[in-house]
Amino acid sequence: MSRRKQAKPRSVKAVEEAESTECASGWDSSVQTDAAVSERDSDRKESRAVGEDGEQSVTSHDERVGEEDLDDDSIFTCDNCQQDFECLADLTEHRTNHCPADGDDDPGLSWVASSPSSKDVASPSQMLGDGCCDMGMGTGEEEGGSGLPYPCQFCDKSFSRLSYLKRHEQIHSDKLPFKCTFCSRLFKHKRSRDRHVKLHTGDKKYSCQECEAAFSRSDHLKIHLKTHSSSKPFKCSICKRGFSSTSSLQSHMQAHRKNKEHLAKKDQGKRDGSSSDVTEQDQDLYMCDYCEETFSQTDELEKHVLTQHPQLSDRAELQCIHCPEIFSDEGTLLTHIDRTHANKKHKCPMCAEQFPSVEDVYCHLDSHRQPDSSNHSASPDPVLGSVASMSSATPDSSASLERGSTPDSTLKPGQSRRKLAPSSDHDDGTWSGKVTYSCPYCSKRDFNSLAVLEIHLKTIHADKPQQSHTCQLCLETLPTLYNLNEHVRKAHRSSGNSASNFPLLQFSNVSAFHCNYCPDMFADINSLQEHIRVSHCLSGGVVAGSTTLEGNHAFFCNQCSMGFLTESSLTEHIQQTHCSSVGGVTKMESPVLQPSQSFMEVYSCPYCTNSPIFGSLLKLTKHIKENHKNIPLANNKRKVKVADLSPASSDVEISSPKRHRVTGDSTPAVANGDYPCNQCDLRFSSFEGFQAHLKSHLELLLRRQSCPQCNKEDFDSQEALLQHLTIHYTTTSTQYVCESCDKQFSSVDDLQKHLLDMHTFVLYHCTLCQEVFDSKVSIQVHLAVKHSNEKKMYRCTACAWDFRKESDLQLHVKHSHLGHPASTGAPGKARKCIFCGETFGTEVELQCHITTHSKKYNCRLCGKAFHAIVLLERHLREKHCIFDGGNGNGNGGSQNGTPNGVTQSSKRSTAGSTAAAEQADLQNMLLKGGSQETANSHEASGGEEELDASEPMYACDICGAAYTMESLLQNHRLRDHNIRPGEDDAGSRKKKADFIKGNHKCNVCSRTFFSENGLREHAQTHRGPAKHYMCPICGERFPSLLTLTEHKVTHSKSLDTGTCRICKMPLQSEEEFIEHCQMHPDLRNSLTGFRCVVCMQTVTSTLELKIHGTFHMQKLSSSGGSGGGGGSASSSPNGQLQAHKLYKCALCLKDFKNKQELVKIDVNGLPYGLCAGCMSRGTNGQSPTVVVTPQEAGDKGTTGLRCSECAVKFETLEDLESHIQVDHTEMSPETSGAKKVTDASPVPKKKTYQCIKCQMTFETEREIQIHVANHMIEEGINHECKLCNQMFDSPAKLLCHLIEHSFEGMGGTFKCPVCFTVFVQANKLQQHIFAVHGQEDKIYDCSQCPQKFFFQTELQNHTLSQHAQ
């Protein structure tokens, strides 16, 4: 989502309605002419908004209304003449110079331009409903109508002005959910509210390069930069005045047109309607804006302004102090002074002072323009009139002098120095003249509105601390001047008051301060006290007109004007407060003042011992109300207003608030032998007492300021005291502020949590249709409505396959289940495959099906078997990093390479005949397996490798998967590739070709692949194997764990010996080596696995142990052969055994010298060899599972009977047969003869029954059954997983669940911890462990009991269940 560019200053907006407002100054406005309206419309169309990228774009009104963020571009409206402006500077200049109704008595009408943050608030005059503009303006336009150019987007109303529309949209609070906490304005979007809040919070990132001013928006900075610009290229054709923009010039021309219309109406009124037409001469009259004198030429008007109103002329602003030349801008003036008057000293033209720079001279000239009163401006409002001295106060300014009395020395001469308009006196009881305001930091006092003053404070004095403005009437503190003005207008103004005689009553509902002894009224408390002390006080301090009988005696202190009821209390007050010793009688005489002498007003509390200094009477009054509420003051009717606001003496150089300190050296006047003190009006009879009294005054003046907190008194100035006192109230803390909502947090974690909870949106993306939703419920509804389509599936109950169409299911039943009924001779005795559970009608069909489960391609490294050669080659590349497919084929590919059947060019006709021949050969082998001819036929045919190579295979032309039967290939193509058996036409071949072509292409050989993983595996073949395994002995890296194991064997120091290093027993073969390693159980480690008894290296699996045995035995045979060739007379028998390897039958364990004497059969994917005798017993109906070993045949009482299915050993033949009938009823007798024998454990053990729960072993089945029954009685049938608290009904299911725990997050693959075979199901891995690996292969040992486990999760569950405290 792109963010809209910041609003830029635009030209003035045209006025679309007639001006119907009559202002208070007596100017009557009329409807503008059509020419003026058309001119403004053309100017509006030609106005362009310049963006940040420097490009210009014309924007019409309709486009601006349709913008999404229209609420963020405020319109500035003049409340006097109802003109709309889009630029803050244009409105300010209009109100200052051009607005004809700017002389009204409402200073709050220019509220909109007070600051960038206040332009979004409703106008005070609009909220209160008063003002000169509302008298003539009807409310119909603001309420809206129909057919107007600015329609509301929430209702059917439309408005004639954009400002009315924006004001109306604020009432739709339900449509505008985001509210500004500062000005309560509503917004439709959160980003608009956040951008607006920055105007309040002061996020000022746009700084001025000319001064230290900073702004939050770029358009405000551009407005400010115009104050530094000296160019005014746009000139007025009437008065030749220059302007910086066309909008300012246009607004100025409107003033000229209104002057003409006003003169025309005035002239027509004088003629009493005698002539209806206005002459051409009257239309050309030009009127002065200040005295209403008319002129026929513009030159005469300019000459009149320069001569009669020089203080108001624009040309009188910048005049050289050395010569009468006038300049239009400050830069030209300074350049003129540097060039022409560079050698002259900078001297003040009004006094004899000299200054080092021109800037200092101009700052000094401002001091000559200050009036005698501390109130710099003639404001009509008692609260707002003295902004500099009464309203602006910081929270810690109670101990500082008034800012208004100390002008800022850093003021630049370029700031406006326009002189004040002459204000009329108040003697006639009426108020007239222009309202002006003064700055509390500098000497500027010609601000005609609070808005202009606010802009001045925020631009020129932005580095000053934040001000708090206090109301003089109720002492309430307000943040801005605008808020103070509104507070006075609402809280202290009575609508029904008549203020014709007293102008102060126009702005306050509180009556002026009344004198208790005469009907006079005064605007402030200082004037009232001075009036009482001068007019109503006699020589003895008694107020004139009061009598002692009535008890109205009032005695006032000449020093601080405090009132007392008795003369004794007044005398005591003077002795304690104003002097250390009384030398004479106190008399209340007003001293003679010299108005021409400058003075400084200071106030101090008379009730505090160490009184702080107050710069204004307001601060002293607030201090007395807060700290001295119970002290009685002068008894008069205005006790609260007069007595509480009485000023007190100060211990600085000026004591009285209305006295002037005499600067010249003067001696006390001696009259009638008395020495009067000119500081406190005390008289002394002796000169010594008078000198002692003066000494006390000097001590008070020289006494240093003390800190009220720590009583430190070494402060030379008030600023030093204030800086020191600030330290006591200042503390620093680190807070983390949210940029969006300005909330503060003490730590980064709390802020991040707040951002995640409040300012982070979680979106939900539908991957099916790419739609985005903002809540989980929404996307659930979307999935339920759009993507939850019912679809009927057809499932085969025999093999649990699902089909989308009924025809596909029928085809599957036809090929897989039709035509295989059970034998009639043996009802219910259908042959069932022990591997997949599928049933067959005849034994031949079952045997043919069993061949599909055989895996003819075995890995010579790890013993894993595969159906197809391509799978074996992939296994060699991935697991063993062998890239030659022929090297890894241990059975069918070692001599003859790839089988002939694994080709894509297999024909169905030949495949059918080959399958029939295969069935005939298999049946003949089963019937004549015990004869010698069978063995001879095997020898004649060239061995089992040739038989394997001649077997036909049906390969998939898409993925390369090979099957022994065509039906299996068809099922594979239907299940995995969705290709039906009948699709053999050209269309299906095209579809097949498109399907075969993958989307992932190799950049090296241009081969395509279906998935990215396949391409990644193929790319590894070009780069070579990745070496991730490092040898801990030499640091060399290897691509697989197998190659690393083979490398580690080469570091063995026992390379030429085949003896055990522990018991020194010689080892002759690999089988003896493995058997002997198991005879030393103390060498086994639960963490790392086994140890080789020859080289003592630690191995982690039986596979690695086999590699060690092969390596050591090969070294032993090679060393023995070399020794025999060296001249040994007789060869050792060990060498003969090694030269002639023996092969054993899997059932009877007889040894055979030739491998061809054994018949190969695969059971569970593993190859086994059976002799001819075992095969003949299987065909004659004898149980092949009953096996008597030749070694134990001659021993009495010892038998070797094992079950071929579960490899459990039995003592008698009856026990084995009963076990098969009970536990393995579905096992085929023809396939049960293959016995599973591992090379690692050729010696049978005594205990053959083991409990899965506690791993105890038993000799007989009855013992383990009793043991399992005890488990069920004691512990129940439920078995709980301690890792996740899930319940299972058997220990085997619990073990399968623990295997899943071990491989969580591994991508759905399960790897055997012993031989590293990978499975996709946990139960398959469990079956593999039970079938291949035994008790000796377990890795993890329990530290508290002798139990061992394959997986760590088994050990953890065992520890929590059996050994938990």
Swiss-Prot record:
The residue ranges flagged as biased composition, category Gly residues, are: 885-895
Q: InterPro entries annotated for this entry?
A: Znf_C2H2_sf, Znf_C2H2_type
* Name of protein: Zinc finger protein 423
One Gene Ontology cellular component annotation held by this UniProt entry:
nucleus
What job does the chain carry out? Transcription factor that can both act as an activator or a repressor depending on the context. Plays a central role in BMP signaling and olfactory neurogenesis. Associates with SMADs in response to bmp2 leading to activate transcription of BMP target genes. Acts as a transcriptional repressor involved in terminal olfactory receptor neurons differentiation. Involved in olfactory neurogenesis by participating in a developmental switch that regulates the transition from differentiation to maturation in olfactory receptor neurons.
Q: Where is the composition biased (Basic and acidic residues)?
A: 37-51, 261-274
Q: Which family does it belong to?
A: Belongs to the krueppel C2H2-type zinc-finger protein family.
